[in-house]
Each structure stands twice: as C-alpha cells, then as structure tokens.
C-alpha cells in the first residue's frame, strides 16, 4: 500500500516583488535594520503595493490575499514607520484586532522583532495575554503605542476601566482588523459596533482591513471605518491550484483509527502533519490509541492554558513535534450548519411552491408548527452545548489564522461541519508558495452508528458536507479526488488495532484529560517566570509525552515484518549469513577457578 504524499519544498517566489527593494520604500533605518535581521530580501507583492499607499498617500487599505503572502508585515511596517517618524507621543496610536489569542501572540512577536532597534521607545501590549488585573493596569497606565487584542477582550477592558484614566483610544491614529472574515464569523460584529464609540472615527483615522476573502459583510466595516480606501486584490488562486492536492476517502467509523495507525506507523506521509478532530474527547482517544504503537503526538485544544497552546505552536514550528492532533470544535460551526440546512429547506420549498399552493392550509400550518418544534429543539441543544463548553476558551482558534509552518499534510480525521471550516483547515498547508496535501475521512450514511465507541454524531452529515465542499472547491478551481486504500494489505493490522482500541476506555480518556491539564497548568503558571529566565530549560518541556492508558501493551510498539506490505519488507536475500545453530564455542569450557581473595592483614608476614 502506498499513499501519494506531497513533500513540502522550498518556497517558490510567487509572492515576491523582485523589482522593488526595501530601500526604495523610504523606511526608517532602524526599521530597515530589523527587516534585514528577519531575512526579508524583497517585499512581497501585497507589501510593495500597500506600504507606499499607506505611508505616502495616507490611504485606507482593504487587502485580499491568501495566507503566507505577507499581509501582517503589510500593515505592521507602516504602523511602526509612522510612530518612528512622529515620535513616541503620550497615548495609544494604533489598535490591531485579531480573531484569536494564538494569532494575537504571533502578531505581537512579529512586531517586537520590527522594533528591536528602536531603543525601547515604542511600547507594544498584547492584551490577550494572561495578565492579572494589577499588572494589566500598570501596563495600560504606561500608554503603549500599539495595542493588540481580540475585539471581545478590548471591549471588556474598555468597559471595566471606563471613566478612569487608564486606557484611552481617543488618540488612536490607526485601526487594523486582521482576518476580517474570521472576526465576523466568530461573532465579533457587536463588539466592533461598540468599539466605534471609543475611536475617533470621524477624525483622521487610517484603517487596514486584511482578509483572505472579500464578502458582503466587509462592506459594512468599510462604511463604518474607511474613507475612500484603496482595494488591493492579489489574484493568486491559479498559482496555488497546483500546490495543494486534496483527497477524500470513504471509510467506516473504526477504520478511521485503523488507517491512521497504518499511515503514521509506516511513515506514509513525509513531513509534519496536523490531524483535525471535532471534539476534545475524540482527540484524546486518538492520542491514546496511537501512542500504544509508539507513535508520539501532542494535543492542542481549548481546555489547555493559553501559554501551553502558544508553546505547542512554537515548538511545532521549530520541528520539535511532527504530529499534532488539533481540536476544532467552535460553536460557530454548529450555527452555520443549522443556517445551511435551513437555507436548503427554503430552496426546496421555493422550488415546489406551485405544488404547495394546491395543498390545504391546514397542512401548511402543521408543517409550520413542526418547524417551530424542530427550531426549539435545536435551541435547547445549543443551550446544552454552551453549558457543557463553559470551561473552553472562547477565543481559541487553531484552524484559523494561526501560522503553522512547513505543514506537509492536513488530515481531517473528522470531517468539518461546514465547507467554510474545511477551507480554513486545509489552509494550514500549502502556504507561502509551498506544496501540501489534504486527506479527509468521510463516513457514508449507511455506516454511521455501527461502531458505537468510534461513532461521532456529526458524521451523519458527512456526505452532505462533502458535496458542498466539492462544489465550493470546484468554483475556486480546485479538485478533490477520491482515494481508495488497498484494504487487503491493511487487514493484517486490524487485530492489533482492535486490541489497542479496546484499551482506550472512557475512563482512560477522562484520566488522561485530567493528567494532561494538571501537567500543563503547572508548566504554564508556576514555571512561566522560571522559563523566561532560563530559556534553555524550556527545551526539556515536551507536550508529546505518553499519557499511558489503563492497559499498556508494549508488544504493539513493534511491527512484525509479516504484517508489512511486500514493498516495505526487508529483502530476505540480503540479510547476510545466519547460522542454523548458535555458536557453541566455550559452552563446555571449564570455568577457571578464581583465586581466593586474600586478606592482606592475615597474610602479612613479619
């Protein structure tokens, strides 16, 4: 059996503008020095277009470009350049809004590198970090020039300190909203409306709206915050068509685990892989299952502390880990599924309008009442889900906006519930001109529920969601190909997978979650300051240690040769000479009598 894996190669210079140099942009020497330190030889197309418009013409910018095209530097460089030219004044001059805490930290680290040679004259505050109230007050009183935050955290801080001289946005000259489409899909529209009253919108406020897609919701923000913006669209879809290879494989509920075991144990995918699951328990079940075969992996979900999540992303980007199991269980997706289903029903109703007119009014009323009952049931389920997920971080988002570097493959172990979520998951690979592969497991409707322990509720709609994904990808010029595994060669691994899967009980999953949380809380809180002072010791902190299920089976870690496909077995002819009988030289050799130990005091002669 073989799986067509796409190896990541060096970045093709698709996005670079070779005709433009950094010196030609008339930037501050300190900023140029920082850019050179980062290793940026030439600006990208989006940067060479946006930076002159922002600095020379003072235009608002609306930029649409794919991930890895340099959108962050396109707004970060003009912000810092303006502050360096005008000098550090009293008051906050720039606000950067991002959808998730992980992305907030990445933007903060990037901007810190850009101000490396500014002699600490520019202050940057990452409001999404875990600060105590006293520490946060002291940082805000210093009036940092740049504030990076999620919309909800910024509004929460503004309302908590309203009427106090702690945080004041009346001096802001630049507003940046990064990943606009994600911010709107996360439900931050109300927060953006509240933010409008705190900002000097009617004055000279320069705005950057950065997004991978442009939709109708963007027009609302454009009307609120922009005046005669310059709209930049980097049409790079065609150049990326050959970079991303997409497959889907129809399989059973248990065979998902079996195929995952075979793929990772035989190293069929070369390079780093992100595996997406739809809930937290699912992630731990897969981790406990794989680690019985000696397959090391780490978990990323919304229950982990923010410091641990950020460290996992950083270590993954440094190639410390090669297999990451990420939970993508955002409640927005459930709402989108309901909206899509309702939209389809409305479309079907409109198509059959003529037939329905001939029916009795009583039937229409009954249908209306049934729809109301179904709607109430959906609301009840959503309320239960909200209560159940109260401990999760609402600003967690691993499939959206986070910069995972050099990801060779994205494996959708659980198919996402919407086509939009699929696009964001797949967007973690084939970034910045590099190649990548996406493989999605799909459960046919007739196979759902046959294996209760391995079953997942959202799998009922896998085929419907797949059809939407295929249609959307075809519109964008992409193709998702079916992939057929040679199950005859996989069957030999089934009995071992059965043993390992039975060992992963619900009790083992619960104990693993508690153990993981305890370890991560200790690493995140108590040792945070120690690791800051001793960065070398941070390397010893690993997140892919075995969690040890209740039943450890050491023999599963070794794969016998007879289970491997013929192409992967060792060549018997080249094993060398192996004697039939073991070498018996010395077997009958008499044991030499060792000299008795002598006591030097007793043997001492006068």
From Swiss-Prot:
Q: Where is the composition biased (Basic residues)?
A: 586-596
**Record's compositionally biased regions (Basic and acidic residues):** 371-382, 597-606
Q: Which reaction does it catalyse?
A: ATP + H2O = ADP + phosphate + H(+)
| Motif DEAD box: positions | 178-181
EC number(s) in its UniProt entry? 3.6.4.13
What Pfam families does the record point to? DEAD, Helicase_C
Q: Where in the cell is it found?
A: Nucleus, Nucleolus
Q: Per its record, how is this protein called by name? A: ATP-dependent RNA helicase DBP9
Q: Which CDD domains match?
A: DEADc_DDX56, SF2_C_DEAD
Q: Name one GO biological process term.
A: maturation of LSU-rRNA from tricistronic rRNA transcript (SSU-rRNA, 5.8S rRNA, LSU-rRNA)
Where composition is biased (Acidic residues), the residues are: 336-352
User: What is the role of the protein in this entry?
Assistant: ATP-binding RNA helicase involved in the biogenesis of 60S ribosomal subunits and is required for the normal formation of 25S and 5.8S rRNAs.
**Keyword Mitochondrion among UniProt keywords:** no
What UniProt keywords apply to this chain's record, in alphabetical order? ATP-binding, Helicase, Hydrolase, Nucleotide-binding, Nucleus, Ribosome biogenesis, RNA-binding, rRNA processing
UniProt keyword Nucleotide-binding present: yes
Q: Which InterPro entries does this one have?
A: DEAD/DEAH_box_helicase_dom, DEAD_box_RNA_helicase, Helicase_ATP-bd, Helicase_C-like, P-loop_NTPase, RNA_helicase_DEAD_Q_motif
Question: GO CC terms on record?
Answer: cytosol; nucleolus
SMART domains, per this entry?
A: DEXDc, HELICc
Q: What is its main location?
A: nucleus
Picking any one GO molecular function of the record gives: ATP binding
Q: Where is the composition biased (Low complexity)?
A: 359-370
Which segments constitute the Helicase ATP-binding domain? Answer: 52-232
What does the UniProt entry state concerning the protein's domains?
The Q motif is unique to and characteristic of the DEAD box family of RNA helicases and controls ATP binding and hydrolysis.
Quick one: which residues bind ATP?
Answer: 65-72
Which species?
Lodderomyces elongisporus (strain ATCC 11503 / CBS 2605 / JCM 1781 / NBRC 1676 / NRRL YB-4239) (Yeast)
Q: Where is this motif: Q motif?
A: 20-48
> What taxonomic lineage is listed for the species of origin?
Eukaryota, Fungi, Dikarya, Ascomycota, Saccharomycotina
């Amino acid at each position: 059996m073989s799986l067509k894996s796409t190896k990541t190669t060096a970045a093709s210079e698709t996005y670079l503008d070779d005709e433009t140099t950094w010196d030609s942009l008339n930037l501050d020497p300190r900023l140029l020095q920082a850019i050179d330190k980062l290793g940026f030889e030439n600006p990208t197309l989006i940067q060479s277009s946006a930076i002159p418009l922002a600095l020379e013409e003072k235009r608002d910018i609306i930029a649409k470009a794919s991930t890895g095209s340099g959108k962050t530097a396109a707004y970060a460089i003009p912000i810092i350049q303006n502050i360096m030219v005008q000098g550090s004044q009293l008051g906050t001059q720039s606000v950067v809004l991002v959808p998730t805490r992980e992305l907030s930290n990445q933007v903060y680290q990037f901007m810190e590198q850009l101000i490396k040679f500014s002699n600490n004259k520019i202050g940057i505050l990452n409001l999404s970090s875990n600060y105590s109230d006293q520490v946060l007050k002291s940082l805000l009183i210093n009036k940092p020039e740049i504030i990076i935050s999620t919309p909800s955290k910024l509004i929460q801080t503004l309302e908590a300190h309203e009427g106090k001289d702690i945080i004041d946005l009346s001096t802001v000259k630049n507003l940046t909203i990064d990943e606009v489409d994600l911010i709107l899909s996360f439900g931050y529209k109300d927060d953006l409306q509240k933010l409008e009253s705190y900002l000097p919108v009617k004055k000279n406020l320069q705005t950057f709206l950065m997004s991978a897609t442009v939709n109708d919701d963007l027009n609302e923000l454009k009307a609120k915050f922009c005046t005669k913006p310059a709209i930049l669209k980097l049409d790079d879809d065609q150049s990326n068509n050959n970079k991303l290879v997409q497959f889907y494989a129809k399989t059973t509920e248990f065979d998902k685990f079996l195929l995952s075991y075979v793929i990772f144990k035989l190293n069929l995918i070369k390079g780093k892989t992100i595996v997406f699951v739809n809930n937290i328990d699912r992630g731990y079940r897969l981790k406990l299952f794989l680690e019985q075969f000696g397959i090391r992996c780490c978990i990323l979900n919304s229950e982990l502390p923010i410091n641990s999540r950020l460290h996992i992303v950083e270590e993954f980007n440094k190639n410390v880990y090669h297999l990451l199991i990420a939970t993508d269980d955002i409640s927005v997706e459930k709402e989108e599924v309901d909206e899509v289903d309702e939209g389809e029903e409305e479309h079907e109703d409109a198509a059959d309008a003529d037939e329905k007119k001939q029916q009795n009014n009583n039937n229409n009323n009954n249908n209306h009442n049934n729809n109301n009952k179904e709607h109430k049931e959906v609301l009840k389920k959503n309320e239960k889900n909200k209560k159940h997920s109260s401990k999760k971080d609402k600003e967690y988002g691993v499939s959206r906006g986070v910069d995972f570097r050099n990801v060779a493959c994205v494996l959708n172990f659980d198919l996402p519930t919407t086509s939009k979520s699929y696009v964001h998951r797949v967007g973690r690979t084939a970034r910045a001109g590099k190649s990548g592969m996406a493989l999605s497991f799909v459960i046919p409707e007739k196979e759902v529920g046959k294996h209760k322990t391995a079953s997942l509720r959202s799998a009922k709609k896998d085929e419907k969601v797949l059809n939407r994904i295929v249609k959307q990808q075809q519109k964008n010029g992409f193709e998702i190909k079916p992939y057929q595994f040679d199950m005859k060669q996989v069957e030999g691994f089934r009995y071992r997978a059965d043993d390992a899967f039975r060992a992963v009980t619900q009790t083992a999953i619960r104990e693993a979650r508690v153990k993981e949380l305890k370890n991560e809380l200790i690493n995140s809180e108590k040792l945070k300051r120690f690791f800051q002072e001793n960065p070398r010791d941070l390397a010893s902190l690993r997140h892919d240690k075995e969690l040890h299920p209740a039943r450890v089976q050491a023999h599963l870690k070794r794969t016998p040769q007879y289970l491997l496909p013929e192409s992967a077995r060792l060549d018997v002819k080249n094993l060398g000479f192996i004697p039939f009988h073991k070498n018996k030289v010395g077997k009958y050799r008499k044991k030499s009598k060792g000299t008795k130990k002598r006591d030097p005091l007793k043997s001492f002669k006068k």
